[in-house]
């Protein structure tokens, strides 16, 4: 999974759930692109949130990356995430 670390600085991005989710999605996009995939190839994702109250905001940012057919997804609130971030997302892609 990816947490909101800026790969250039190695630091957690500042801000709230919108900013953190945006960074996570940028990280995932970079990984997908490097492997020859796009978000259209994602078949399953799992979203981990430190607080389920952030689901709607996370979902707003997440949803911008998918066209007609979003992948299967599970979302969970967890007690803690690495480095006390607000969100972590993992994806499985296939061609």
Regions found by a protein language model. Give the residues of each.
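Short, polar/acidic, helix-capping and beta-turn segments at strand->helix junctions
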Residues: 2-95
């Amino acid at each position: 999974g990816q947490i909101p670390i800026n790969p250039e600085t190695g630091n957690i991005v500042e801000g709230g759930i919108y900013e953190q989710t945006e960074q996570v999605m940028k990280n995932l996009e970079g990984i997908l692109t490097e492997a020859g995939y796009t978000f259209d190839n994602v078949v399953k994702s799992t979203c981990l949130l430190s607080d389920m109250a952030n689901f709607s905001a996370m979902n707003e940012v997440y949803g911008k990356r998918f066209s007609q057919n979003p992948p299967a997804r599970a979302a969970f609130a967890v007690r803690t995430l690495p480095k006390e971030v607000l969100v972590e997302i993992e994806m499985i892609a296939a061609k």
